[in-house]
Each structure stands twice: as C-alpha cells, then as structure tokens.
Design a protein with these regions (language model features):
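Catalytic-core "active-site belt" of small-molecule-metabolizing enzymes
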Residues: 2-172
Length: 172
C-alpha cells in the first residue's frame, strides 16, 4: 500500500469525522483485509486531537465473525464529542446501519498500573460503575451494508454516537 495514498484517504475520513460529513466510499483495498483497515483506523485516530472518552470492542458477535470469515474482534476509540447524555437527540442519515444496546463499564485508573495477568475473576475489582448505552452505528461514507469487518474498522469502528444512561455502582 502506498503511504501517500493511505494518508490521503485518512485525511478524507478524518475531515468527514470532524465536520460530520459523508464522503464517497474508500477503496476496497483498504477495507477488505482487517490488517489494512486497522492500519487506516490507527492512522486516522492519530490525526484527531480531540479527547478520548474510552474504547469500544466491535465485531464481538461470534456468528458475525464466522460469516465475515474473521478470527477476532477489534477495538476503536470513542471520542468525547460523540458521547451524549440521556434524552439528547441524534441526527440520523441514510448511511446509518442501526442502533445497538450496549453495556458501558467505567474502569478505575489503577487498572492501567496493574502488572499481573488480567483474568475474568480479577477484572471485576477494577469496574467502578456500569451503565446502559445506546450506540448509533453507521458510516461516514456513502456505503450501505457490511461486506467485511474492515468496513467497520476503517471507519472509526462505525460508531456515530453513544447515548449513555444513568450509571449504577458495580457490586463485585
């Protein structure tokens, strides 16, 4: 892949992301393979200077992974300007794929200083709060449907907005 071309595509996607615009679809060679899509996503995220609210795991449904012939999900950054409080309105365009009900976990800061191996048992002690979340899923490109997991990955994880509910204290 040509770095100059990749940079040009990344600039278009970042511009669409920041200005809430819809652009022409990016070429399939950047989205067909998850490795190339990850590379594009990381380049795009490095060009954005807005604060990050957290991260999302995407492509976690096993049937979807099998259908798209992928082995593992990916993650993407969630930016603060895309996170809304409850009862806020969201503009939806025709390239919105739908909405998903998600669960959001607030993680304590000492999680990032933990030097031991993280397991299912000890991860619970790092969760401070849990809250419901509605994710508006869509593209910033004139594209319909999902042909590969790279389609979602390359477009900032296809997260348009997150609407957060009220947080509840997490009991271990």
């Amino acid at each position: 892949m040509n770095n100059k071309q990749l940079n040009l595509i990344a600039n278009k996607l970042v511009n669409a992301f920041l200005k809430k615009k819809v652009i022409a679809p990016i070429p399939n060679k950047y989205t067909q393979k998850i490795f190339n899509a990850q590379k594009l996503r990381k380049l795009c995220e490095s060009k954005i200077n807005k604060p990050i609210a957290g991260f999302k795991a995407a492509g976690t449904a096993i049937p979807v992974l099998k259908k798209l012939r992928e082995k593992e999900p990916f993650y993407a950054s969630v930016y603060k300007h895309n996170v809304l409080k409850n009862n806020k309105s969201v503009k939806i365009n025709k390239y919105t794929l739908g909405i998903e009900l998600e669960i959001c976990y607030l993680i304590k800061k000492d999680f990032f200083n933990f030097n031991k191996k993280i397991s299912k048992k000890n991860v619970k002690k790092f969760i401070s709060h849990i809250l419901p979340c509605i994710e508006v899923v869509g593209y910033r490109q004139r594209k319909k449907g999902i042909k590969s997991l790279g389609d979602l990955c390359s477009d900032f994880g296809a997260n348009v907005k997150f609407i957060l509910g009220s947080k509840k204290k997490f009991n271990n």
